[in-house]
Amino acid sequence: MCGIFGFYLSRKLIDSDIKYGEKALKELNHRGPDDSGFWFDKEKGIFLGHNRLSIIDTSKKNSQPMKYNDTIISYNGEIYNYLDIKRKFKNDFANFETNGDTEVLLKLWNLKGINSFDELDGMFAFAVFQKHSLFLSVDFFGEKPLFYSISKDGIYFSSEANPLINLLNLKLINDLKNNLEFSVFGYINSPNTGYENLYKVEPSTYIKASIKNSKICISKEKYWKPNERIFEKGKIRPFSSKDIKSIKEILIDSISTRMISDVPLGLFLSSGIDSSLIACLIKKELNRNIEAFTVKFDKNLVHDESEI
């Protein structure tokens, strides 16, 4: 988990803008205590900030924001197939200075732009500034959060809502639809958040911000949609041994790609089937030992996961 924050304004940055950016990064320090950095261009009106939690390639070379040619990135998440991407485009990429996924994502975007999503398998939220456009995006299912707010002079974004609420003095709104969603689901569906002029980037979506005639121009596009056949009602039949084998292979592949790390890994182990199955496959199929953590609440037996 890292934290990103930034803004792209239709005017030149002034010193107070930079101070606001630094202050917001401090509010996100808990998301990335290993390193903090920012990059800005006063003339272009762009500020990108990043708080880092080091997982892959913990060296300083992997610090962010990271720049390559005319492309700068501030990124939170993990690209599980970054090694495959690195091999696939080895003839297109210049020599790598790091062993992490950030540089792979950065160079992939520099090469393919919005077509980069076709290559990605992972959880991510990132901001990319290229030439005179800012791109904000999150992963296919919105696992990594990214909030944004549009003002008269530009667009602001953050991994968490609080820096934007505090900086822009955003107010709660009393909306029936939002209230119902929160009561039923425990959250409000994106892009809404319950605050005025505060939005959450939707899954499989990218936002492009550009400056035209001294005004900020915003567009939003879906980069992926699930196959319509997923929602069709299929014929019910018993599970076959082939089905079970296929699911097992998919699970093992999915788990193994998520265990690439240069720091110790841990597993939240509940009394449920899913985490127990993951722990079992890690040990028996991948032959890896992993520390497991189970949560117990003394006064809340409903959420007591200690009985495994």
Located regions from the model:
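Cysteine-centered catalytic environments shared across enzyme families
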Residues: M1-I308
